[in-house]
């Protein structure tokens, strides 16, 4: 057996941080079972704080070189920086950027350590629990990979009251039962339908009953974080989540015909489009305000998406995402549309009903979704909130059986898992596992410990591969694209109105991989990106 790594030494307490203002809207984009072998957990060497202050920090390439001599530039940078931050190992350009952004030192938290080292290169406010925003997805996805395994797949099943008759007709209801697949999109629903058609089903003479009992009811009883119910990032979890419960409208101007074409995905059986957009030749302007549709149910049971107003040819093609309808209505429309697309028929339009699959029902088809490794990649690359919440709830359902999945059961599962890893986190507060929360908390130090543990685990490569690559893809595709550090960072981002966070790994130019965690909780957090960029480039240059 390999020698166990050194155990943790907690960082020296620094200036106490205070959690500042209440958080408001998340502005992140939407997007997308082999259990691990047993054995002793690898406990990596957790780092101590630096013994003494870093005396200087190199200027980053993200800023144009000053004409003044380097010594004068460094002196000016240090003069603009908070000396307490610099004495804690935080590079002077980072501290100076915080000051320029109007972010007090107490509102920031940093922890940087080279993998395998026992001493941190930078540690500031590291024990203070902070709101991590979407970097909390690292806890959920690492737990998912370890507890469920990278090859875990969600199942969705179709049952019927009876086998299809000789003519392919099902006389009775059909039942669609979900187990929380985070990515049950049209392509996946089509596979389920194809299996049912291959089993001989051609016509359904009954209702469509949705069995969503795998998840508890009322998971979104507290509402959205900001009241923006039509924003895709606010979609709540459901055992039969279909296509993220979001309609994606594509607006395409055609100057040749002086029209604006509108298409939509996914196709819903009850959805109708009324396109009255007028193509103009002016400047694009605020196209979303002028071209956003109203989506309203009609007396005949259809749902009408109405477009009106002007749309400039200067805007080009755009996609507009709108979360709408209930989960049940959305999934009903998606199944009916896919059934008809595959050549299936209905003796009459099936009514939408909810309920459990009855005993004695006949299994028509079962579909296994994408493997967890692929799901984790979508969650972390694109910071998909509802997919993270689906995974978080699945942890409770799979590892703490005995009833519908709930956030409480999932929280207990994750806490027990952390304890088995030797990761005691007294300041950890879990809410929904996605970071789209005003309540969730974790310290930079604890996040760094988690990342060190992940790097030493068998699923470490899968987790790291799921992270956005600095300047290349995901939520980091536009960050430091021309800097020397581009392509060398693998980091999860976190964004709320008053939060900016980064957590992950940076490969230094001289060799070695570093764990990097930074969290800023302040009303001016959005102005502090320069501090994060300077930190990443400092680590890339060797963190010295």
Q: Where are the predicted features?
A:
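Small-residue-rich helix-loop
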Residues: 121-123, 185, 382, 392-544
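Conserved serine DD-peptidase/penicillin-binding transpeptidase domain
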Residues: 48-100, 147-425, 534, 541-544
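Short active-site loop at a secondary-structure junction
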Residues: 123-143, 147
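Residue-level preference for non-acidic, small/hydrophobic
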Residues: 118, 137-144, 208, 240, ...
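Signal peptide processing junction and immediate N-terminal pro/mature segment
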Residues: 36-52
């Amino acid at each position: 057996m390999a020698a166990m790594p050194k155990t943790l030494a907690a960082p020296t307490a620094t200036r106490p941080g205070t959690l500042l203002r209440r958080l408001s809207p998340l502005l992140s984009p939407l997007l997308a079972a082999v259990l691990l072998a047993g054995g002793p957990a690898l406990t990596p060497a957790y780092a101590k704080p630096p013994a003494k202050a870093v005396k200087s920090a190199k200027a980053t390439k993200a800023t144009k070189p000053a004409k003044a001599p380097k010594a004068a530039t460094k002196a000016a940078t240090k003069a603009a920086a908070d000396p307490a931050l610099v004495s804690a190992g935080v590079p002077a350009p980072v501290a100076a950027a915080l000051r320029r952004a109007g972010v007090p030192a107490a509102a920031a938290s940093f922890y940087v350590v080279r993998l395998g080292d026992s001493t941190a290169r930078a540690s500031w406010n590291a024990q203070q629990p902070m709101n991590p925003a979407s970097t909390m997805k690292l806890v959920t996805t690492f737990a998912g990979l370890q507890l469920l395994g990278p090859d875990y797949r969600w199942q969705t099943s179709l049952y019927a009251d009876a086998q299809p008759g000789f003519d392919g007709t099902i006389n009775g209801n059909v039942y669609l039962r979900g187990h929380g697949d985070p990515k049950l999109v049209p392509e996946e629903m089509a596979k389920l339908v194809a299996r049912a058609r291959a089993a001989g089903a051609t016509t359904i003479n009954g209702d469509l009953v949705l069995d969503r009992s795998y998840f508890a009811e009322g998971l979104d009883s507290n509402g959205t974080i900001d009241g923006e119910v039509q924003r895709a990032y606010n979609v709540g979890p459901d055992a039969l989540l279909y296509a993220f419960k979001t309609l994606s409208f594509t607006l395409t101007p055609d100057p040749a015909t002086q029209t604006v074409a509108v298409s939509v995905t996914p196709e819903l059986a009850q959805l109708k489009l009324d396109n009255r957009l007028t193509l103009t030749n002016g400047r694009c302007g605020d196209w979303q305000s002028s071209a956003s549709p109203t989506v309203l149910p009609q007396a005949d049971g259809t749902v009408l998406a109405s477009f009106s107003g002007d749309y400039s040819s200067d805007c080009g093609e755009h996609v507009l995402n709108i979360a709408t309808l209930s989960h049940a209505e959305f999934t009903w429309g998606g199944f009916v549309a896919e059934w008809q697309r595959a050549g299936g028929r209905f003796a009459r339009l099936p009514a939408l009903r909810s309920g459990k699959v009855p005993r004695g029902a006949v299994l028509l088809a079962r579909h296994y979704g994408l493997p967890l490794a692929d799901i984790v990649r979508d969650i972390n690359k694109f910071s998909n909130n509802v997919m993270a919440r689906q995974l978080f709830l699945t942890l409770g359902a799979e590892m703490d059986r005995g009833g519908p999945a709930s956030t409480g059961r999932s929280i207990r599962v994750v806490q027990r898992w952390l304890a088995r890893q030797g990761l005691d986190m007294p300041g950890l507060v879990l809410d929904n596992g996605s970071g789209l929360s005003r309540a969730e908390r974790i310290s930079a130090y604890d996040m760094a410990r988690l990342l060190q543990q992940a790097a030493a685990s068998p699923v470490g490569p899968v987790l790291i591969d799921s992270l956005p690559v600095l300047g290349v893809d995901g939520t980091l595709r536009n960050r430091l694209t021309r800097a020397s550090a581009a392509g060398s960072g693998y980091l999860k981002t976190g964004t709320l109105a008053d939060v900016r966070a980064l957590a992950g790994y940076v490969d230094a130019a001289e060799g070695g991989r570093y764990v990097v965690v930074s969290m800023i909780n302040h009303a001016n957090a959005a102005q502090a990106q320069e501090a994060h960029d300077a930190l990443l480039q400092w680590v890339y240059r060797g963190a010295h």
